[in-house]
């Protein structure tokens, strides 16, 4: 299945278009299946999208929405590095969503303490609770993600054990190339069970990785190449990030 590409003049325009599209996609998912399962991401574009979505909050029946995370820094709950904390400031504190439908990953000062693997397993078990019988994860309606200049997505970095994982849906990451070193991440297995995967990428520094991912590079070396949805794979790019896409 080929990916779809939308190119925007700048990152601000890209984020606004993504927010509008996400609000509409949530509405469609609720109409079709009575709920929407969305995987959030951090980073400048991911948090910018959440700020935009907060302005569209009245368009969405939040009582039918479940929010998950693609990855998280395994740091204390109130640490500013937490994707969850940034999401609360940008979106969650401004909408009327039932707390039981917000599913953050465990924090480093939580019940699992230093046991990163137990924390990852607990999140994997949580995902299974929302899946159809016999399946390890639900079919997320949208998995949002950014991409690093070397092609990493979530906390799946090039040529690491996590990006090569073939059975687990969620794993712990130690010695991350990007600080902080300890993280929890959904694997490519989980990502690929999403109906739609959206990659939001901006900036010249990421143009080479965008071109490599879209050109069929191995996912072990360019993890974004493995970010493929069951129905839709959508690249939302600014002109700088799109500059090296072939033809």
Curated annotation (Swiss-Prot):
Pathway linked to the protein: Carbohydrate degradation; pentose phosphate pathway; D-ribulose 5-phosphate from D-glucose 6-phosphate (oxidative stage): step 2/3
CDD domains listed in its UniProt record: 6PGL
InterPro entries: 6-phosphogluconolactonase_DevB, Glc/Gal-6P_isomerase, NagB/RpiA_transferase-like, PGLS
Catalytic activity: 6-phospho-D-glucono-1,5-lactone + H2O = 6-phospho-D-gluconate + H(+)
Keywords assigned: Hydrolase
GO biological process: carbohydrate metabolic process; pentose-phosphate shunt
Enzyme class: hydrolase
Molecular-function GO terms, alphabetical: 6-phosphogluconolactonase activity
EC number: 3.1.1.31
Similarity comment: Belongs to the glucosamine/galactosamine-6-phosphate isomerase family. 6-phosphogluconolactonase subfamily.
NCBIfam families: pgl
Reported function: Hydrolysis of 6-phosphogluconolactone to 6-phosphogluconate.
Name listed for the protein in its UniProt record: 6-phosphogluconolactonase
Organism: Mycobacterium leprae (strain TN)
């Amino acid at each position: 299945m080929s990916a779809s590409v939308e190119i925007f003049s700048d990152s601000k325009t890209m984020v606004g278009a993504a927010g509008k599209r996400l609000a509409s996609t949530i509405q469609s998912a609720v109409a079709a299946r009575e709920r929407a399962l969305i995987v959030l991401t951090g980073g400048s574009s991911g948090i910018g999208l959440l700020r935009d979505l907060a302005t569209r909050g009245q368009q969405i029946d939040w009582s039918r929405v479940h929010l998950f995370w693609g990855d998280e820094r395994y740091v204390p709950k109130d640490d500013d590095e937490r994707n969850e904390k940034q999401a609360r400031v940008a979106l969650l504190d401004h909408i009327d969503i039932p707390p039981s439908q917000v599913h953050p990953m465990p924090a480093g000062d939580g019940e699992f303490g230093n046991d990163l693997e137990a924390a990852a397993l607990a999140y994997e078990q949580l995902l299974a609770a929302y899946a159809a019988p016999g399946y390890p994860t639900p079919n997320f309606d949208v998995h949002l993600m950014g991409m690093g200049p070397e092609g990493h997505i979530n906390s799946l970095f090039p040529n690491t054990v996590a990006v090569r994982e073939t059975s687990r849906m969620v794993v712990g990451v130690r010695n991350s190339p990007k600080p902080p070193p300890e993280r929890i991440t959904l694997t490519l297995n989980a990502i690929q069970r999403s109906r739609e995967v959206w990659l939001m990428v901006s900036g010249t520094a990421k143009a080479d990785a965008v071109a490599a991912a879209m050109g069929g590079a191995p996912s072990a070396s360019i993890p974004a190449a493995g970010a493929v949805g069951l129905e839709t794979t959508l690249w939302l790019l600014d002109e700088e990030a799109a500059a090296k896409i072939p033809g």
